[in-house]
Every structure is written in C-alpha cells, then in structure tokens.
C-alpha cells in the first residue's frame, strides 16, 4: 500500500474558515474563528485520510514572479481583514506546536510550493491529497494526486474531491487544459486579464476543440464565432501572459525534507497549551488522558487523619501562604494551604476533622501570616477573621483587573495566562461531575484540584502584582478593590430582611392584575389563546387583527419587545400584552422567586460580585437585587417587601445623575459644568438649547426627550438608537444630537478623544485607572467597530461612576465601624446605597451617608446625593 501525504493550502483554508465560521474570540479578546475552522477541517481530513506525511504551505507578503511579469496581478483583491490577519501568526504557532511542517518561500505562492511537493511525492510513488479552497489547484490533479475542496457550512464541513477524471467530468477538460480555459476567460479574483470578450463557455468550447491555447492560435482561421477569432487575434500577448500567470510552478526552487514532514503525534503538551489558551474546549478531548499529568504533583501533600493534620498546623511557620477553604453549596470539603510553589498541602474535612476545627486552625495560621494570598478573600472571610490592615492578595480580583472581559477566572487560566504553565482544569480532573458528587466518586481528583488552585495562587501572586503596577492599576487594586471585599463580605453576612406576608400580598396584587389583563386581552382578540406563545400571539396580531409591519420568520411572526413597543401607542391590546409580560416576569422572578431566597433568619443574603462586569460595576446574584424594576408602579412596590429589623429604619442614598456629572468633569465642558454649579435642571437646560425654546417654555415632552439625549450621549447612542427611543425620524434624531454637541462642544471633543485614545491604546480607561480592552475597534466589520466606539465612549464614564460608588461604600463602611455605630450598610444597587440604621442614629447616619458619598471623588461639579429614610425600602427611596 502506497504512503500518503496531505498538503494544505494554509491561507486558502484559513480564509475559507474565517468566512465560514461565526466570529469567535477568546477571553483575551483574540479572534479565533479562522484558526478554529482550519483545525476542524484539518482534523476531519486527517481522520479520513490517515496520512503518513503532512505539510502546510503559506503565501508570503512579498511580490512573486507573477507580480514582476504583471504589476496588477491580484491587484483587485481587498486587503485582508484585520480579524483574519491577526490569526495567521497564531495559526502558524499552533501548527508548529503540533510538530507540523510549514513551508513558504519569497517570490512564490503557496500553490507553487504545493505543486512542487506534490510532484516530488508522486514521483516517489505516494498518494497525494491537496486541501485548498482555490480551484486553480485542479490543474495539479492526476490519478495519484487528489484535490480536496472543503466547504464550511453551519451543519459541518463538506468536501468535494477531484482526481484527473473528476475534473474532466465536471469541466469537460483535463487538468492541464484547465489552465488554458482560465487563461482565456481570465480570473477576476487573481486579476488575470484573459482575452477580452471570451467567457467561460467560449473558453471551454475552444479548449475542448483545440486542447490548448497554442493549438487554438494554430487554427485561428477555423475558429467561430467570428468575434472570438477577432478577440484572439487582437490579444495574443494577453493570452500568453495570462496562461503563464495561471500556471502553477511545479519546479519551485525549494529544499523540502520529506522525512521532516512525517506525521507523528500532533497532540503534544505544547499544542494542548494552545488549545486551552484559544479556549477550544471540544478539541481538548483529542489529547490523551495523561496530558494533564504534571510534575508539580510531587509537591502536593494530602492529609486525612486528625493527628497528621494537627502536626501540619503545629509545624507551620511560614509568613506568607495561599489559603482557601474548598467548599461548594455551603459544604466544606477541606482546606488548601500553599506556603510556596513547592510545598502545597490539602487538609481534608471529615470524621474528627470538622469544619469548626479547620476554621479554628486556619484562624491561627492566618493570624501569623504577614501576607495572605487567596483566590477568594470574600469566601475566606466566611470562615476566618482578617483585619483590613493585613496584606492580602486576592488573585482572582487581580486577574480580573488585568482582563475584565473574561467570563470566569479559573486557576488553570491563571496558570496559563500569568505563569505560562499548563495545569489540568476542573473539567480535566472531574469531568462533568459537580463538586459534591466528585467528593464521593473522585476524591483524589478533588484533592488535586484544591492543590492546583492553591499552587497557582502562590506561584502567580508576584507576577500579578507586577503586571498591575505596569498597567497603572496597583493603586486601584490596593485602595478600591481590596478594601471593597470587606464591605461586600459584611453586606452578604448582614443581608436584608424580607417580610413574607408582604411578599404574599404583593404576589396577590400581581395575580389580580394579570387576571384582569388576560380577560381584557382575550376580549380585544375575540378569542382565548396562549399569550405566552409568540407563535399564537403573532397570528392574533398580524393575521387576525391585521396590524402592520409584521415580520415573519421561520417560526412565525416576531413579537419581540421592540416590535410591540412600536405598535403600543396605536393598539391598546399591545400595551396590555407588554404590561402582562412585565407583570408575569415580576411574579415569577420576585413574588415567587424571592420567597425561595429567604434564609431561616428571615433575611435575604444576596451574593455580590466584583469580577463580573467589564466596566467595574458590582453585580448581585441569588437573588439579583440589581434588576428590581423602578419604572412601573407595581415594579416599585416590590421594595415594600424589604423592611428593617425592629428598632431600626432604612436610610437610602442615591447619587443624582452621577454619570452626567462624571461626564461634565472628565470632558471639562464649561457649559455643562456651569449648569451643575448653578444647580440648574440639566434636562430642562438641555431641552431649551437643543430645541431652541426659552427655558420657561420648555414642555414636559421636550424635557423627557432632552433627558434621553443626555443619558444617550453617555452611552454613545447613535441617531438610529435615539430615533427608536423617542419614536422620531432618524433625521430628527441627527438634528437633536448635532444641537446637543453645539450646546456642549467640549463633550464632542472629549468623546472623539476617547475613541482615538482607545484605538491607539487598545483599551478605554476610567479616572481611577481601570482599563477595559476594546478589541472591537480593530474589527473590519462596521457594526462591530461602531459597537467598539460606543464602548470606548461609555466605559470611562460608567466605569468612573462605578469606581466612585465603590469608594463611597468603603468610606461609609469604614466610618460606621470607626465610630462604632450600630447602623450597617446592607445593599448597593447601581448608584444607590441602603443602610439599616438604628432609630436613635437615624439623623446622624443620614448626614454621615451624604458627607461620605459627596466626598468620594473630587470633581469639577458637586456630587449631589438624595437621602431619604422610611420603615421599608419603598418609603426610603
């Protein structure tokens, strides 16, 4: 049986994959879809072919001998998209990591190298498969050389195969004659001119009849139609040059070592690292199970028995260590301690080794440390007390600041990104098992997982801090993010009291109103139907009731919120449907959902996250209290459910227009600054200027529209977006925005500068140095680029506002503690803070809260704070 070689046209397959696979990026912001598609095609080919040799050829950027012959060769091609260009070196690195031979040569195209190597291999009796999306390579097909043309589709990769006989069957000419057909008809993609006036049909007929261009010219007098004869007669030189341009050079002067192209194990440790970095998780399954085995494990020590665990604690004397409780869903499975990257211990919880015992010993250990390192300081604070003055390093928060675009910050990513090491991930160790089940079924794997996590923390800490320093974010980390951990930990511990009876009453109100809406909707529709079914709703609205602008998709008419909102002003039934949707969501999420979140102490203990959003805003989960609706009355009423404990009141403080005030400060626009300094109604002032109306004559509608413009500008709103928000024409929206920038010219200059700076630096930056990468700005896609520009404009403003809120939280909490007040900060929602205050401290705490929030940042305009109090959150807001 003959040996086989597979030859891949690198740029061609990469290009085909780029346009065939939807856009993908990894958590670093690197575009990966072309590499992903290329590898899928390559693996499919290798699985089918099982070759003995493999080589990938790439084009070079220098001109080739064809350019020297014809300056305009390939001159009509658009420049390579930046998203694809950045993937070419990555693709080469991945191939090299797999041990795959890459060939390229100045002055020659990949086609020439493939043709040359194919000839060598065929001469040695090998079977050859050439993989390319370029049909020019069909001229290389023989009985031993097969051309394979992949087509990337959503359903997978389909491949067309061509031996010499297949080319004849499909194109009526032999592979060698295929060159002449292309030379006569020309090729717009390569800008090969061909013979003017001769298309594919005429060219094919001529070559079928005469076998070559040379023979066609030898029988020129016989050629019909007359126009073809005349064109050939007048463009002889063009025909000859086009044939030379179209002919693949099969004797390129390259030194090719066939033995070096021998296919060995592609699934190397180096390739594994690349797959993890690119986040091609499904490709990791191709690697052997022992790929995750690591020499580091010789430094891991696991202790199960009480006496050996006690001996560990008794002998521990390090002043620096990584410490973390390994737990899941409230159950502690053990304690991981790494005093260096060569001494990692895991102390299991069970039997005589109780959670309380581990907490007691961990407390003593932490008290003796000068530097405490952990992947989750907030989680650790549930088990041990740590003073805010201790030198603490939270590796997750540090990693988040360095790259806030990631979805999660796992220890294996930290090892890869910071240490350049490959360590097994949780999936590698546990598969799909949850922690609880793994504790029973794979205890040793769970122990390794805890050790790897502790190892990565202690090993990465110095580099993390160095990178924060290099990126100018060490102060942000030290003075905002780390102190905030203690604030959030206390807030989670305190929780907020929820009144079950009030929650049931609220649910009953919603149920009653939902029933009223159902009845009214059915009456207006003339029949009952499933309001929650988009398909049934679409039929009612756009077929039965004949509403305009129905957009039909494969599954029926679109009944998305934006579609219904445009219809609502003219159709009462649509307004009711929108309200019905809002109320049913309120009932399921809050009336029903919150009841499940009330702990035995009668309070809801939400989890606050500081490593989730790209802008630096805090988010909350289980439950998400950030999304409590405020625009509709029934939505606001949910706040009545939240009440203070006996003898206490709620004090609520809300920043007034913080993002606009930040915009005024950062832009330095004198008109906006002056309006705030004179405590004027900023929306009314804007309306007066934008709509050229005397201040006293500004209507409520004009003020609302001006408010939409003010806040829309902060979010980089487009004329289209504003027109949708205000239900006006795009031209009117353009006029509003233009008038706005005439009123506040400094803002226009500032926003333009933000975009320019972000393009140059690759990131947007807040007043406090927080960075937000904006890879979308380098996209060749207009929509993506526009999105990136909006991010570049918004992130510095929204991020600065988020930083100010965090500073305010720290100041408030530290002052409450310093003055030993009974009142506690218990909740943060966007620009709003909620304190559960002792009744006898109410007035003092209101003053304290306002003072600390106002002085959280030194801006060119005052940070105004609205402070209210009440016997529930609704009253206090």
Please give the residue ranges for each predicted region.
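Extended two-metal-dependent nuclease catalytic cores across DNA- and RNA-processing enzymes
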Residues: 2, 24-25, 75-254
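Conserved RNase H-like, two-metal-ion catalytic cores of nucleic-acid enzymes
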Residues: 5-6, 10, 16-55, 71-72, ...
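Active-site-proximal helix-loop-helix substrate-binding element of RNase H-like nuclease domains
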Residues: 154-158, 164-182, 335-469, 480, ...
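Conserved "right-hand" nucleotidyltransferase catalytic core of DNA-directed polymerases
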Residues: 231, 235-352, 368-372, 433-630, ...
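Function-dense linear segments that define catalytic or interfacial modules
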Residues: 337-341, 402-432, 449-456, 610-694
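Active-site palm subdomain of RNA-directed nucleic acid polymerases
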Residues: 468-480, 484, 804, 808-829, ...
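Conserved catalytic core of nucleic-acid polymerases
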Residues: 493, 601, 605, 610-613, ...
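C-terminal polymerase-core module
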Residues: 512-519, 523-575, 742-790, 794, ...
